[in-house]
C-alpha cells in the first residue's frame, strides 16, 4: 500500500483510512488499488474481526477525482468495472462487518462506498450528496441500486436528481445512517462500536452478513434454505458450544472463530 491509504489496527479492529485530504479523498486508480490491498489484508488477518472505513481530513470522500478522472488509457466504463467494482465487491464479501465512518461529507462514488458498507456512522455536521445531475453524469458505484433498495424508487430518484445535501439527521430518519455522533468523536465512537462487535461470535457475524447480502437479491425461500444450511454449520462449531456453555456458566464467551 502507498500513502493513499493508512492501515491501522486497534485490538481486533482494522482502521482503513483514505489519505488524500488535500483532494478531499477523491478517488484515483491508485486509491482504488490501495483500498483493495487494505481490505485483502484485513480479510487474511485472523486477528481482525471488524473494520472501520473512513477518510482523513475534512471529508469521507468527494467522489472521483475529476482532475484525474479523464486521464489514462482506460475508459470510464473500464475504470468502474475493473478499479472500483473489485473494492466494492470486497466490502460486500469480506466476512467481517465494515463500518463506514463519515466525516464532512460523502459525495459521488464516495456516497456509494459509504452506503455499500455494512453499517454507517455519520458525524453530526456531515452530509451525503449525489451531485451527478449538476455535472451531466449518472450516479455510479451501484448507488442507484443501493438507494432504490434502501429508500424505494420515488424517494431515491428524487434525492438523486435534485442533487441536494442529505444531512446526517435526515439520513438517520431515512434509515440510511445507523448512528449520528458529535464530529469530534466520530473516529473514536466508530472504533468503539467496532470493538463491541468483535465480542460477538465471528462465525455468526460472517454468516448473518452473507445471508442478508443474499436476501437483497433473492426470494424468501432461497434465504430460508441458506439460513438452514448456515445454522447447521454453526450449530456444529466450537463457538456455538462455547456460547451455550458461557450462557449457563454466566460468563462472557470466548469465541475463536471455529
What does each of the following model-derived ranges do?
Residues 19, 64, 103:
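Histidine-centered beta-alpha loop that forms part of the nucleotide-sugar donor binding/catalytic region
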Residues 212-218:
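Short, charged, surface-exposed hinge/linker loops at domain edges
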Amino acid at each position: 500500500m502507498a500513502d493513499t491509504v493508512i492501515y491501522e489496527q486497534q485490538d481486533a479492529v482494522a482502521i482503513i483510512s483514505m489519505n488524500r485530504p488535500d483532494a478531499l479523498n477523491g478517488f484515483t486508480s491508485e486509491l482504488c488499488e490501495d483500498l483493495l490491498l487494505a481490505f485483502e489484508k484485513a480479510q487474511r488477518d485472523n486477528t481482525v474481526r471488524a473494520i472501520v472505513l473512513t477518510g482523513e481530513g475534512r471529508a469521507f470522500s468527494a467522489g472521483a477525482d475529476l482532475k484525474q478522472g479523464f486521464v489514462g488509457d482506460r475508459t470510464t466504463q473500464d475504470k468502474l468495472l475493473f478499479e472500483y467494482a473489485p473494492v466494492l465487491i470486497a466490502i460486500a464479501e469480506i466476512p467481517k462487518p465494515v463500518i463506514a465512518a463519515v466525516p464532512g461529507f460523502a459525495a459521488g462514488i464516495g456516497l456509494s462506498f459509504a452506503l455499500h458498507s455494512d453499517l454507517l456512522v455519520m458525524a453530526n455536521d456531515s452530509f451525503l450528496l449525489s451531485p451527478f445531475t449538476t455535472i451531466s453524469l449518472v450516479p455510479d458505484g451501484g448507488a442507484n441500486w443501493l438507494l432504490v433498495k434502501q429508500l424505494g424508487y420515488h424517494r431515491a430518484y428524487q434525492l438523486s436528481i435534485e442533487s441536494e445535501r442529505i444531512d446526517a439527521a435526515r439520513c438517520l430518519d431515512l434509515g440510511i445512517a445507523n448512528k449520528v455522533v458529535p464530529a469530534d468523536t466520530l473516529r473514536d465512537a466508530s472504533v468503539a462500536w467496532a470493538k463491541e462487535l468483535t465480542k460477538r461470535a465471528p462465525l455468526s457475524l460472517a454468516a448473518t452478513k452473507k445471508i442478508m447480502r443474499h436476501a437483497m437479491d433473492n426470494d424468501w425461500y432461497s434465504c430460508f434454505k441458506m439460513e438452514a444450511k448456515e445454522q447447521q454449520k454453526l450449530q456444529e462449531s466450537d463457538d456455538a458450544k462455547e456460547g451455550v456453555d458461557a450462557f449457563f456458566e454466566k460468563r462472557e464467551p470466548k469465541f475463536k472463530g471455529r
